[in-house]
């Protein structure tokens, strides 16, 4: 029965992608780069809550043209809500990306096969996300629109974590039968954000950048949030090219941008930021339509959340960059087993 349901969900996934596959006449290079995100809480000496994620982002015009793309639906939603009117009167340009990834969540005691009702539920999400970045250079303003579609509760989550824990010689997780939407359930999230650059001293060898962003999500995470992001050092990429605030645990894939100074020293900078979020609903903790053995009620999850992050980026070859970061969040649910989730991540990117 479970395999039959998962087969039906895969069919829904393929149909949605085929319907979404449209090409728009936007002047943009076919391939502007790629980015690989690797998150894991073992790097932060933890093994619970958001325990890890991996995502590959491909950017450029190809993100609109790939068979496995949600660009048509995302663009239709923007048009339905009149998002295009926000930037249409002023000079602007647009960049696109598509991301494929997965995220895993566990309680603290992963050796226990029985349901654990007073800790975070097991959870997983396998997803595809399409993003459009619109930049208005004269106003130092940028907009992000992202549509994420995926599946909660797939059996593949257990096998992936077992493989990772075999490599790291960690305990085997035995409770995946109790995960949110166990057996598989489709889900989605639509994200809109606007960001404003406040400081950008382009002519200095080392410079500061400071920007604010406001974001709203509707779907498997429904929330509103505001953030402040900063970076300092030897910077050759535009202010809108780094978006640590655009994340739902793992960073949602934004377009990759090349540096504007390939004759001078390569990039080397630090970055940091913080955000405040008011979350109305989280499918990864409260479940969705399908029955979940372990899930929280609305009263058991924290509504007001805060996050902080700190990272560093090094361009070790022309337009090839590596980043390492730490990220921490306030408690996401109530009770004695609630902790402050902390995780670390490695990002490798190549821009063209």
Annotate each language-model stretch with its function.
Residues 78-158:
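Long, hydrophobic/aromatic-enriched structural stretches that serve as scaffold segments
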Residues 48-54, 122-126, 143, 182-188, ...:
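Residues that define the transmembrane beta-barrel architecture of outer-membrane proteins
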Residues 54-60, 100, 128-134, 149, ...:
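Residues on the lipid-exposed face of transmembrane beta-strands in outer-membrane beta-barrel proteins
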Residues 108-109, 234-352:
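Outer membrane beta-barrel transmembrane domains
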Residues 63-67, 138, 198-200, 235-238, ...:
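Repeated loop/turn-to-beta-strand initiation elements of outer-membrane beta-barrel proteins
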Residues 113-118, 173-178, 213, 294-298, ...:
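Extracellular loop and loop/strand-boundary signature of outer-membrane beta-barrel proteins
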Residues 28-30, 62, 94, 124, ...:
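Short coil turns and loop connectors of transmembrane beta-barrels in diderm outer membranes
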Residues 34-40, 96-104, 147-153, 192, ...:
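Transmembrane beta-barrel strands of outer-membrane/channel proteins
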């Amino acid at each position: 029965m479970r395999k039959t349901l998962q087969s039906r969900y895969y069919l829904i996934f393929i149909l949605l992608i085929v319907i979404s596959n449209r090409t728009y006449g936007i002047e943009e290079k076919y391939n502007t780069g790629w980015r690989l995100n690797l998150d894991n809480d073992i790097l932060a000496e933890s093994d619970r809550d958001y325990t890890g994620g991996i995502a590959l982002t491909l950017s450029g015009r190809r993100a609109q043209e790939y068979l496995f793309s949600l660009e048509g639906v995302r663009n239709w939603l923007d048009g339905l809500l009149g998002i295009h009117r926000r930037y249409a009167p002023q000079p602007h340009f647009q960049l696109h990306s598509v991301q494929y990834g997965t995220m895993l969540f566990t309680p603290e005691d992963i050796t226990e096969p029985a349901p654990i009702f007073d800790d975070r539920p097991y959870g997983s999400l396998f997803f595809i996300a399409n993003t459009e970045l619109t930049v208005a250079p004269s106003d130092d303003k940028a907009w992000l629109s992202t549509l994420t579609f995926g599946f909660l509760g797939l059996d593949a989550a257990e096998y992936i974590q077992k493989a990772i824990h075999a490599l790291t010689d960690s305990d085997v997780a035995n409770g995946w039968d109790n995960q949110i939407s166990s057996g598989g359930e489709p889900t989605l999230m639509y994200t809109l954000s606007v960001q404003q650059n406040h400081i950008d001293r382009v002519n200095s060898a080392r410079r500061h950048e400071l920007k604010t962003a406001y974001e709203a999500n509707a779907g498997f995470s429904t929330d509103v949030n505001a953030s402040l992001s900063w970076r300092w050092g030897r910077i050759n990429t535009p202010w809108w090219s780094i978006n640590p605030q655009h994340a739902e645990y793992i960073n949602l894939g934004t377009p990759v941008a090349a540096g504007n100074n390939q004759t001078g020293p390569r990039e080397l900078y630090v970055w940091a930021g913080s955000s405040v979020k008011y979350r109305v609903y989280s499918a990864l903790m409260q479940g969705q339509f399908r029955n979940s053995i372990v899930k929280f009620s609305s009263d058991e999850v924290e509504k007001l959340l805060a996050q902080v992050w700190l990272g560093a980026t090094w361009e070790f070859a022309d337009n090839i960059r590596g980043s390492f970061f730490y990220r921490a969040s306030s408690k996401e649910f109530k009770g004695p087993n609630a902790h402050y989730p902390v995780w670390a991540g490695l990002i490798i990117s190549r821009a063209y």
